[in-house]
Amino acid sequence: MAVGKNKGLSKGGKKGVKKKIVDPFTRKDWYDVKAPSMFTKRQVGTTLVNRTQGTKIASEGLKGRVFEVSLADLQADTDAERSFRKFRLIAEDVQGRNVLCNFHGMDLTTDKLRWMVKKWQTLVEANIDVKTTDGYLLRVFCIGFTNKDSLSQRKTCYAQHTQVRAIRKKMCEIITRDVTNSELREVVNKLIPDSIAKDIEKACHGIYPLRDVCIRKVKVLKRPRFEISKLMELHGEGGSGKRGEAGDKSERPEGYEPPVQESV
């Protein structure tokens, strides 16, 4: 019999004993995701994050998260015209258990884009970088399709190259006009009903009739320096109330002295 130490027994543990499995969800907390006040439904969902432990702060782990929500969910309706439009919201600050988000972009669903593309027509696309009055640099993509005239006997409705260039120029002009003179809040309010695309369709009717004109995508390329006051205003929680309601300054004559109390 060989004489020697048993390494397994010297460590005080038994062979084959598994470690106790800890559920990772016990170390996490739920936070409510809040959309800006431009949308009807403010509570859009919940998100998980590890609790604050040591130098790892929970709120810092939440900042910068991007949430993609359908416009139908944000507006709390079942309208099919809203369901294919997706808005991206980015977490900028945490107040208690609420994650305050800001607009981070917009896109269309893939099935909607595939449905719009058809044969015997011309697809016209345009994109331009524009800056809002409050310092957000946006890249806006627009798409449109030529429409067949009801009186035409042709099978196709192709536009000429000069007409395509004129339509693209008109798209860029209208997008620049509507975005550069507006703040981000006003731009989002225009994207919800897609009023910019409707203006483009009306303006281009004289060049060539269009159909299914829409703002296909919006990217936020650059944003101004973060300010908590502007974010709170975006969520409808800015300092709109009157100042000094709780402690107004009382008017007293000069040389006023408070009366001496007889007992305390």
UniProtKB/Swiss-Prot annotation:
Region (Disordered): 236-264
Basic and acidic residues biased stretches: 236-255
Any one GO MF annotation of this record: structural constituent of ribosome
Disulfide bonds: none
One Pfam entry name: Ribosomal_S3Ae
Record keyword Ribosomal protein present: yes
GO biological process, one term: translation
Entries under SMART domains matching the protein: Ribosomal_S3Ae
Taxonomy, superkingdom: Eukaryota
One cellular-component annotation, GO: cytosolic small ribosomal subunit
Compartments where found: Cytoplasm
Predominant place of localization: cytoplasm
Keywords: Cytoplasm, Ribonucleoprotein, Ribosomal protein
Quaternary structure (record): Component of the small ribosomal subunit. Mature ribosomes consist of a small (40S) and a large (60S) subunit. The 40S subunit contains about 33 different proteins and 1 molecule of RNA (18S). The 60S subunit contains about 49 different proteins and 3 molecules of RNA (28S, 5.8S and 5S).
Family as reported in the entry's similarity comment: Belongs to the eukaryotic ribosomal protein eS1 family.
The protein's name: Small ribosomal subunit protein eS1
Organism of this sequence: Spodoptera frugiperda (Fall armyworm)
Biological classification of the source: Eukaryota, Metazoa, Ecdysozoa, Arthropoda, Hexapoda
